[in-house]
């Protein structure tokens, strides 16, 4: 573990990765209360002048890997999962608009009646104008997770950090739900994560971040105000950097 006293920077442009399961409140479908709370937190950050892009999973609707285990072709089940991410994206867009935050959804699969196509230069312009950009439909290709989408989009739009929102406080040396004495890392390097066999994101996403020196901040979304704290550089969660 690196020195917990190391200063953290505040961030100007962030990529927020949200798990789809959180949007469902642990159930299939959408929990409006959860989506509203997330929208309120994002609106607070945007009001402070931070540029925010978002990638949401689709696990509250479909999980491609699980459907594959039941005999469905993996590619088809992944496409179903991508559609789930679009439903989540549109829901978050609606709640953000109600907060007075101008929001655009860009999808990797063309669906012109509900969203813009993914265009990184346009996404950057939206961010510069203070709009939130939500990236839906994953990478638009099967076999790639939304973690990987988050890493790739963060790199392409020039984000300062990937904010990995979880239902736990950060990265631990053991599962805190099983081991009561598990210790949370305040800060750790990409290399140390691999050496210690810790789980931060899937392997492809993590490799993208490590190879391109993209920091990852893992934090608990369920604590209200944590998105603003993370963006401001407060010492919450676990910061993974080179």
Curated annotation (Swiss-Prot):
Keywords: ATP-binding, Cytoplasm, Kinase, Nucleotide-binding, Pyrimidine biosynthesis, Transferase. It is found in: Cytoplasm. InterPro entries: AceGlu_kinase-like_sf (IPR036393), Asp/Glu/Uridylate_kinase (IPR001048), Uridylate_kinase (IPR011817), Uridylate_kinase_bac (IPR015963). Pathway: Pyrimidine metabolism; CTP biosynthesis via de novo pathway; UDP from UMP (UMPK route): step 1/1. GO terms for biological process: 'de novo' CTP biosynthetic process; UDP biosynthetic process. The keyword Transferase applies. It comes from the Bacteria. One of its GO terms (molecular function) is UMP kinase activity. The keyword Magnesium does not apply. Signal peptide: none annotated. Inhibited by UTP. It catalyses: UMP + ATP = UDP + ADP. Homohexamer. Belongs to the UMP kinase family. This is Uridylate kinase. The gene is pyrH.
């Amino acid at each position: 573990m690196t020195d917990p006293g190391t200063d953290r920077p505040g961030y100007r442009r962030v990529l927020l990765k949200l798990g789809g399961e959180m949007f469902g409140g642990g159930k299939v479908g959408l929990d409006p209360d959860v989506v509203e709370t997330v929208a309120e937190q994002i609106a607070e950050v945007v009001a402070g002048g931070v540029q925010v892009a978002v990638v949401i999973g689709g696990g509250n609707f479909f999980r491609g890997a699980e459907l594959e285990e039941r005999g469905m072709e993996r590619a088809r089940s992944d496409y179903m999962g991508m559609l789930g991410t679009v439903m989540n994206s549109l829901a978050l867009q609606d709640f953000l608009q109600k907060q007075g935050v101008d929001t655009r959804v860009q999808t990797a699969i063309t669906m012109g009646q509900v969203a813009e196509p993914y265009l990184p230069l346009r996404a950057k312009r939206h961010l510069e104008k203070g709009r939130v950009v939500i990236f839906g439909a994953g990478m638009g290709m099967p076999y790639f997770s939304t973690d990987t989408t988050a890493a790739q989009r963060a790199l392409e739009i020039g984000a300062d950090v990937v904010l990995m929102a979880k239902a736990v406080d950060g990265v631990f040396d053991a599962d805190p739900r099983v081991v009561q004495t598990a210790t949370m890392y305040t800060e750790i390097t990409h290399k140390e994560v691999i050496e210690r066999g810790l789980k931060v994101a899937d392997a492809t996403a993590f490799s993208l971040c490590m190879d391109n020196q993209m920091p990852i901040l893992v934090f608990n979304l369920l604590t209200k105000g944590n998105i603003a704290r993370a963006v401001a550089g407060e010492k919450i969660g676990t910061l993974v950097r080179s």
